[in-house]
Amino acid sequence: MNQTRRETWLFWLFALLILATGLGLRDPWPADEPRFALVAKQMVESGDWLFPHRGSELYSDKPPLFMWMQAALLWLTGNLRIAFLLPSLLAALGTLWCVTDLGARLWTRRVGLYAGWATLLTIQFTWQAKKAQIDPVVVFWITLSCYALLRHVLQGPSFRLWMLGWAAAGLGTITKGVGVIALLLLLPAAVASLRGWAGVRIHARDPRFWLGPLAFVAACGVWLVPMLVAALGHGGGDYRAYVDDILLRQTVTRYANSWHHGQPWWYFIEVLLTAWLPTALALPWAIPAWRRRLRRRDARFLIPLGWVLLVFVFFSIPSGKRDMYILPALPMLALALAPLLPGILRRANAQRLLLGFVLAFSLAALGAGLAMLLGEPGFERKFMEGRDAHVADGLAWMFAAVGGFGLGSALWFGRRRAHAALVAMLTALWLLYSLVGAPLLNDGSSARGLMRNVGAAIGPDAELGLVGWREQQLLMADRPAADFGFKRDVALQFADGVRWQRTRPRARWLLVEEGLGLPACIDRARARDMDVANGRRWWLLDAEATRGCR
């Protein structure tokens, strides 16, 4: 086995180890994971896969493709803990394959591996890959689209890849509306082609060019056409409101007039310099090198870097911003960085910077662990609200172990191999988080602990209704639970809940979020305080506790 093959096996071993460890060891956590998992679970149970539901209401915030994936895996495995995380794992591995293979085709196999390592070791990429949000799947579709379009433009013509690139962008669009940004890659490609850069052709005069847009429309139509036919033929106002919300308010209106997550225009620069560590540490050496490559008219750098810049601009325009919005740009940045990394890592200053990062990260983790073990800091008390005391001890030892291992790695590998110390420290971080941290945090973060206590309090034969609920309560309930709407005003939910309870007063209970305060009509002497979960206090009410409510 030659060295490149050994390095390839080593990369994929670490990728599987880092990304797959912990699969099946936790439940969905807020804010988004329980929502998608609940929708997927209800799809399997109800058989209605076309119109997602959150409890009794239609869920129109996102297209259903991601939830379809979770639901299909739940149907196949019968295990929610595995099914809800598996799409993110598969998408992350697919993204790594795209970037490593593209690097190998445009440069060498070793350059492809550097692109893979730069993507895998970026903190935000791995953090998102170990969560069950939509973003890892969107990143995969966008990266697959860029992969196919770049191969067509730089190594083509290949109209099969051209169609694949457009189709992947379409599937990204029906996963999350922003999937269409993959097609922005054609703008720098067109500029390079029009200016006569060597080896760049879009082949726009070929009649087969139009197969690409057709593939995009066909991919979007997989969901859009049957949804529109069913919704408009249904005749119900709820379904027409669903169409208006998902096609207009959640896309065009949300982009043009964001109603939450307000951030300044430079927010994503901060994200790049923090969440994209340690990869961002190479930028001081990469930027001058990129400038030299662009002067030489090397389109392998212009097209991905131009697209990354367009993605940053696109997401910086609206006021609403979240850190994961620009994650799709990371693989192409890593691709453009990869040919430069061997030279950068040979620089003594780059190794010193990496070593400084390892030492700073390790000392911070060790300090946090020791502070939790030896003191009683305010951040610990706030963090541990609603959790058992043993969780704090376990997390403290986890932080201390990560910090100690990182310091040991820095001493072992030294200044000249700081990149190896970095890989060792981050691997230890993700393994310990997956095997120790996540299971310890699970009961409090997922509402499993709360709902287990609720089930024990009301007994196996009782019925449960939820008021002011969050998705994790309905998902983790040990029995079918009644809900009275999700977006409705809590006072209206409570009034309907009381009426529901009175039809079988001895068997029905209400779980109510305290919010700004329980209704004054409740008999607090009869109400059961179920403690804090996910930062909210919950009360369990029997019919006697709500007797004075109308």
Where is each model-derived feature located?
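Membrane-integral, polyisoprenol-dependent glycosyltransferases
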Residues: 1-351
